[in-house]
């Protein structure tokens, strides 16, 4: 079988496996791997019946016409990984590849493709299949279920050598790789995209296999690793075991993780820092406790939350807090309360995102009667839906607010050169990105993706 795994590119960098595999657009000049594709490729590589090609156009900045030039043969199967910010163009590209006889079978994967399966089947019937499961599961099933189970603990040691891994770097130029110790989350926040794609459960990878993944990445020259777990410290015992083995085996690297802040304490933070943690992110979301509880989101206690953030800073860990704006009943008063909370907690960084409802069709239609799930629901090159989520604000106001709040926050952080940093790395970069997105969207309304 001649198989091509393809991550496309249309002019804007996409982190296609983030946000529960919906994908996000990235305005900074850095590229990260798609872990789902890395595992899919590793599984396929181990099957002797497969002749595997991989084109990570997102990493190599290859437009669709460049991808066509790179392809040297007709494939039996092309699997194209879609993402919310580009799904309209992903469908167009997949259709082009099939209609122009570059493949016998075209498959579209990713969370957004799953959500649009009915629409795609009706409006783009040339696309042979739309996966309803993660890409690596689809590949495993297609090859006859080579893995003993679909747990991430059954996955082989990921093989980055199949990809242009030298492109996976931070804006500083350092290589940054991604890996899992766990996937999924059992907490059950109703707006969480991870639960709707991976299920409301935890799936753990054994510590020894995680160590093998780390050693593989270090052998390739990666100096910074990001654990892509949605709740890294969900199993306290496993985190202690992992950190102890990193320390005992003398594995030297810096790492990032995301977790729920209330699961931390000083003892756990200490060993994580000793093992190399330099950056941690977590969701605070809103100052409105009643709002959070209505979405099944546990509420942090202010004093304990502030104490943990302060202790992380004492340990020289960079903290990033996520906040949500644009809940259906959002007002200027609730926005002000959330912004004031962010200032009180004083994480080193803060990101304000627009509320995204559950994308399960029955729940979405209950909240927004008459809505249809089509590609137009997903704004090109934006990390939000084309949807007025808040009764008191327009979508345009929300898009502007999320940028301005992030700028204002960074300008108020008590750090040297905070205002300059906020202007150069937040406001200025965001404005350049917004300008580029508007220009690209306008162009793609007039021409085919093959003409960019």
Task: Set out the residue ranges of the language-model regions.
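Radical SAM enzyme core and accessory elements
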Residues: 2-5, 25-26, 46-49, 70-77, ...
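Short, solvent-exposed turn/loop segments enriched in Gly/Ser/Thr/Pro and often Arg
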Residues: 58, 83, 112, 228-235, ...
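Short, electropositive alpha-helical surface patch
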Residues: 60-64, 240-246, 331-348
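Radical SAM [4Fe-4S] cluster-binding motif and immediate context
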Residues: 160-320, 340
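Conserved strand-turn element in the central/C-terminal portion of the radical SAM core barrel
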Residues: 287-296, 309-334, 353-357, 383-393
């Amino acid at each position: 079988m001649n198989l091509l795994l393809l991550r496309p590119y249309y002019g804007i960098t996409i982190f296609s496996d983030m946000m529960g595999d919906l994908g996000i657009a990235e305005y900074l000049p850095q590229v990260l791997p798609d872990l789902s594709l890395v595992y899919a490729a590793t599984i396929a590589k181990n099957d002797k019946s497969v002749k595997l090609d991989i084109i990570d156009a997102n990493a190599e900045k290859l437009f669709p016409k460049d991808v066509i030039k790179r392809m040297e043969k007709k494939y039996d199967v092309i699997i194209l990984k879609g993402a919310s910010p580009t799904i309209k163009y992903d469908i167009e590209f997949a259709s082009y590849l099939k209609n122009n006889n570059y493949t016998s079978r075209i498959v579209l994967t990713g969370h957004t493709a799953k959500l649009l399966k009915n629409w795609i089947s009706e409006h783009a019937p040339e696309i042979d299949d739309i996966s309803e499961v993660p890409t690596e599961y689809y590949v495993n099933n297609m090859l006859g279920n080579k893995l003993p189970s679909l747990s991430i603990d059954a996955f082989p040691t990921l093989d980055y050598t199949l990809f242009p891994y030298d492109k996976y770097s931070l804006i500083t130029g350092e290589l940054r790789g991604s890996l899992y110790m766990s996937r999924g989350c059992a907490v059950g926040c109703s707006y969480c995209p991870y639960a709707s794609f991976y299920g409301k459960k935890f799936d753990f990878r054994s510590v020894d296999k995680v160590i093998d993944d780390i050693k593989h990445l270090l052998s390739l020259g990666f100096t910074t690793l990001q654990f892509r777990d949605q709740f890294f410290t969900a199993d306290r015992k496993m985190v202690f075991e992992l950190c102890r083995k990193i320390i005992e085996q003398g594995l030297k690297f810096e790492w990032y993780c995301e977790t729920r802040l209330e699961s931390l304490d000083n003892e756990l933070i200490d060993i994580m820092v000793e093992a190399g943690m330099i950056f941690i992110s977590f969701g605070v979301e809103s100052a409105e406790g009643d709002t959070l509880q209505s979405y099944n989101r546990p509420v942090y206690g202010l004093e304990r939350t502030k104490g943990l953030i302060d202790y992380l800073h004492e340990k020289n860990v960079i903290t990033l807090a996520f906040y949500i704006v644009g809940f259906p009943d959002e007002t200027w008063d609730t926005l002000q309360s959330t912004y004031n909370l962010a200032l009180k907690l004083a994480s080193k960084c803060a990101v304000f995102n627009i509320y995204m409802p559950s994308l399960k069709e029955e729940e979405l239609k209950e909240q927004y009667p008459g809505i249809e799930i089509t590609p137009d629901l997903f704004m090109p090159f934006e990390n939000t839906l084309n949807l007025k989520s808040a009764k008191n604000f327009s979508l345009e106001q929300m898009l502007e607010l999320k940028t301005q709040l992030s700028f204002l926050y960074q300008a108020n952080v008590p750090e040297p050169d905070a205002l300059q940093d906020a202007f150069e790395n937040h406001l200025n970069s965001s404005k350049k990105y917004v300008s580029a997105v508007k220009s690209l969207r306008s162009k793609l309304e007039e021409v085919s993706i093959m003409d960019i």
